[in-house]
Amino acid sequence: MERKVLGLLIALGFLGSCLAEKNCRVDNFEVMKDFNKERYAGVWYAVAKKDPEGLFLLDNIAANFKIEDNGKTTATAKGRVRILDKLELCANMVGTFIETNDPAKYRMKYHGALAILERGLDDHWVVDTDYTTYAITYACRRRNLDGTCRDSYSFVFSRDINGLPSESQRIVRRRQEQLCLDRKYRVVVHNGYCETN
């Protein structure tokens, strides 16, 4: 009997440590330390993404982050969308970034060039990047009462339209797990449907 109780206590302790290790409250997610927006600027290609609720870019997504003369960060993105379940087209999105106390945590005000496309003000957190190969971003649109995210989206970006090297993929997978989004991403194809230049 004592062995069973001891085994149960060990199992409960292990379970508790696993749950504590995977804390999915948004405020506990780590972002890029010492983020440098000048190094981050330029063209990034989405190679994977976790979708939010609502109409969103599907594939062939390229984003261009720019530092304006006044120091503000802006972005344009282009990608394929499907409207009314039938019509497919390449859509342009425009974003303006509002800086916060943490350089890697922006608020992004965005809108589509077409009125039917999404518009809003979302978090835009740079979770990790090496500036030359990969970047992973995260946004939580709505939170649950317990602080976890109810509606989020995330992009894995590459400087190379053909994807990420295996070493970068391993880093990105670890970060996806830390965001509690492991196995929630889908591959973003680049088949020439939209111009990326």
Curated annotation (Swiss-Prot):
Substrate binds at residue 118. The keyword Transport applies. GO terms for molecular function: retinal binding; retinol binding; retinol transmembrane transporter activity. Disulfide bonds join 24-180, 90-194, 140-149. GO terms for cellular component: extracellular space. Keywords: Disulfide bond, Retinol-binding, Secreted, Signal, Transport, Vitamin A. It is found in: Secreted. Residues 1-20 form the signal peptide. It holds the Pfam family Lipocalin. GO terms for biological process: retinol transport. Belongs to the calycin superfamily. Lipocalin family. Retinol-binding protein that mediates retinol transport in blood plasma. Delivers retinol from the liver stores to the peripheral tissues. Transfers the bound all-trans retinol to STRA6, that then facilitates retinol transport across the cell membrane. This is Retinol-binding protein 4. It comes from Xenopus laevis (African clawed frog). The lineage of its organism: Eukaryota, Metazoa, Chordata, Craniata, Vertebrata. The gene is rbp4.
